[in-house]
Amino acid sequence: MKKYRLPKNKRLLLACLLFVSMGSMAQTIEKWYINMPDILNPTLSKQNRMELLEYHKAGQGDSIANLFKHQAYLLKFDTLNQHITVKNTPSSTFEMKILNQPDSTVIIGIIRTVCAPVCMSTIEFYDTAWHSIPLRFTMPTAIEWVDINKIPTEKIDLQWVKNLMGVSFVSLSFSDKDQTIQAKNNTLDFLSEVDRKVIAPYVSDKNLSFKLKDRTWQRNQ
């Protein structure tokens, strides 16, 4: 039986496609972190980022001086779950995670958290060409942690509670176990000791969890 062979030009095209595909698959959290545009992480240069990871891998430490001469610390470097967290400055943290999708596309998630002194986060998503992806994530508000039904309305005014929790301080993080986002309510840290004592019994200390579905991050119930 005569074997069929692809024309030479088609074989070359197929080889190129395979090469590009393999190159994309070979990219790791380390490569994405080091080679990201500096504007996304202006506190540490590309050289800083590379040296920070190289020192860690060589067992020579987990810190390096940032561009402002403060120490930056590597808090997490998980190559298995494609997750990295760096304390860029004494009051700010940078977190990156690779989110592999069922259709083989790759999403790069970035969380920036600033504690001044109460912690708050922002979150962004990028494709592998570092174009911003408009995935919808609605930051939860502090009132979502309050169990309104348990508040004794004869003693505590509900409108006072809503006003008190009207300013939200929420920090985000990527889960180590799966591709979810965890939201932590830090608003109690912003309140006076008197107000905190009144409202704290009705505020959950559990994180809220969000998963990606149809380009929207939805809260897990």
Go through each PLM region and give its residues.
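Surface-exposed loop/turn elements that mediate protein-protein interactions on large endomembrane-trafficking
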Residues: 74-83, 127-136, 213
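N-terminal signal peptide c-region/cleavage motif recognized by signal peptidases
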Residues: 21-23
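Short aromatic loop motif centered on NTY/YTY
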Residues: 136-212, 220-221
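Bacterial N-terminal signal peptides that target proteins for export
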Residues: 2-13
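Terminal domain-start segments
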Residues: 27-99
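Exposed beta-strand-loop-beta-strand "reactive/processing" segments of non-cytosolic proteins
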Residues: 97-117, 183-186
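Mid-length scaffold segments of soluble, non-membrane domains
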Residues: 106-140
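Short consensus segments that form the blades of beta-propeller domains
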Residues: 85-86, 113-119, 196-201
